[in-house]
Amino acid sequence: MWPFASVPAGAKCRLVETLPENMDFRSDHLTTFECFNEIITLAKKYIYIASFCCNPLSTTRGALIFDKLKEASEKGIKIIVLLDERGKRNLGELQSHCPDINFITVNIDKKNNVGLLLGCFWVSDDERCYVGNASFTGGSIHTIKTLGVYSDYPPLATDLRRRFDTFKAFNSAKNSWLNLCSAACCLPVSTAYHIKNPIGGVFFTDSPEHLLGYSRDLDTDVVIDKLKSAKTSIDIEHLAIVPTTRVDGNSYYWPDIYNSIIEAAINRGVKIRLLVGNWDKNDVYSMATARSLDALCVQNDLSVKVFTIQNNTKLLIVDDEYVHITSANFDGTHYQNHGFVSFNSIDKQLVSEAKKIFERDWVSSHSKSLKI
């Protein structure tokens, strides 16, 4: 019926947030707990979840979500949780707690063993989906600031489910030739919507390059293109910006995003605001990078602030016309090696709502000047 139905603006997407209880503001948007709860409650056939790791029992709200998943699985709803091979620390406990949930570990880069499953998304019944930076952990559901998008528009959910099929093909328990055959089957039909064919002003982008499939957009290409074409403003809220790629303990310079930010500020006079995280999960290069941007662009309209509470929000807004929400840092290792899906939109309402979130965070008491 989709070809004959009008496409709703923004593909029925709503912003979703987790805000820790110790923050000095609240959100008007759906909470991550409410989003996951709704997906589970409305599911009739299946729920597919992709996350680097799975540790929902670490907080009360996370445990409630996992208990609801357990109840759904006991009613016959098919539940599959994809985890990265290196993120399965709590797998035994979860399997014993709920044997009806199918946990599958994946290795998206068996050849070099450097890539991780970094994507955070849920899909149910080809009807509802979530994509953002909330992994399936108690912290992301309750105590760590995150941002994502929920939609109950079936065409968009179906398109995200194709990504799940791709990642699932890299089941670490299977032989390599089975992985390759499975991937070959799912990649040619990997997407219906992309930068040249968004649906309701919405499309997904993907990483890494070897998982793109037919007509998918490489996330790096889209992000850099938007940064390079920025005319008036760039707002970035990220855990980290790291212009390096790490392989086997060695670091290599990867300046693509870093240079695009500097060029926008110095060459084109674009107003840039950068809000970075500052907690123990930060790369050691993160604060050095923030300080270098601040110093290099001291004569330009570039401002840097540090968010003092655990903040895993990863948000980019360009010219108040485009929004990008992802699970990856602006980090060479993430963009060159890891598997993830990002949300993109040019829908005016969605961009406006994301902008309000950035403005709220930027002026909050939790945002401190880098110079303090």
Curated annotation (Swiss-Prot):
Any one GO cellular component localisation term in the record: viral envelope
Matching CDD domains: PLDc_vPLD3_4_5_like_1 (cd09106), PLDc_vPLD3_4_5_like_2 (cd09107)
GO molecular function, one term: phospholipase D activity
Statement: the UniProt record of this protein carries the keyword Lipoprotein: yes
Entry's EC annotation: 3.1.1.-, 3.1.4.4
Gene3D superfamilies: Endonuclease Chain A
This protein's record includes keyword Hydrolase: yes
Motif (YPPL): 153-156
The name this protein goes by in its record: Envelope phospholipase OPG057
Species of the source: Vaccinia virus (strain Western Reserve) (VACV)
